[in-house]
Design a protein with these regions (language model features):
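Terminal amphipathic alpha-helical/low-complexity segments used for targeting or macromolecular assembly
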Residues: 1-66
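Left-handed beta-helix
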Residues: 70-71, 76-79, 84-85, 89-91, ...
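Solvent-exposed, flexible loop/coil residues
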Residues: 22-24, 79, 99, 126
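Short gly/ser/thr-rich secondary-structure transition/capping motifs
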Residues: 48-50, 68-72, 90-94, 122-125
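Generic structural signal for beta-strand residues in well-ordered domains
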Residues: 60-62, 108, 127
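Alpha-helix N-cap and coil->helix boundary residues
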Residues: 47-51, 102, 153
Length: 153
């Protein structure tokens, strides 16, 4: 069966499930590798080298003039993250973003945040996944080492 481009991301946006054995999942694997490479490049630069932002802009597909993210930073699906104006994410953030993450205006995040938007299917836990979006509301301040893990069906 042939699947349209972006099909796997539609499934993720709708909560899944997705199946890693299906051909459509290759697009997700490609995005994960793209994101890992861009994060690794950004994280390899010295903290006082402002050019690390170029990799993060490519990761998220937008200019980050109004957003500040400190490295080290890890995100597996840059195409599933949106950030409004004035967002600040301190170092050591890990975003497992396949289900989607939205940072509304003015969100401030302390070091060490962890956000998970994916879960394993309870019956086929090695091959199928379900998803749920996380939205951090306008002007929220998130403390150090906070974990967000969606409770998924």
């Amino acid at each position: 069966m042939e699947y349209p481009k972006g099909y796997v991301f539609e499934l993720m946006a709708n909560g899944g499930p997705t199946d890693v054995r299906e051909p459509y999942f290759m697009e997700a694997i490609d995005e994960m590798m793209r994101a890992r490479v861009l994060c690794a490049k950004a994280n390899a630069k010295m903290p006082d080298d402002p050019s690390y932002v170029e990799e993060l802009e490519e990761l998220f597909g937008r200019k980050l003039d109004d957003v500040r993210i400190l490295t080290p930073f890890i995100c597996d699906f840059g195409n599933r993250v949106t950030m409004d104006k004035g967002v600040f994410i301190n170092h050591s953030a890990i975003l497992s973003a396949s289900g989607g993450i939205e940072f509304e205006d003015g969100v401030q995040v302390a070091p060490g945040i962890r956000i998970a938007t994916i879960n394993h299917d309870f019956n086929e836990r090695h091959t199928k996944y379900t998803y749920r979006k996380v939205t951090i509301k306008k002007n929220a301040w998130i403390g150090m080492n906070v974990r967000f893990a969606q409770v998924l069906p």
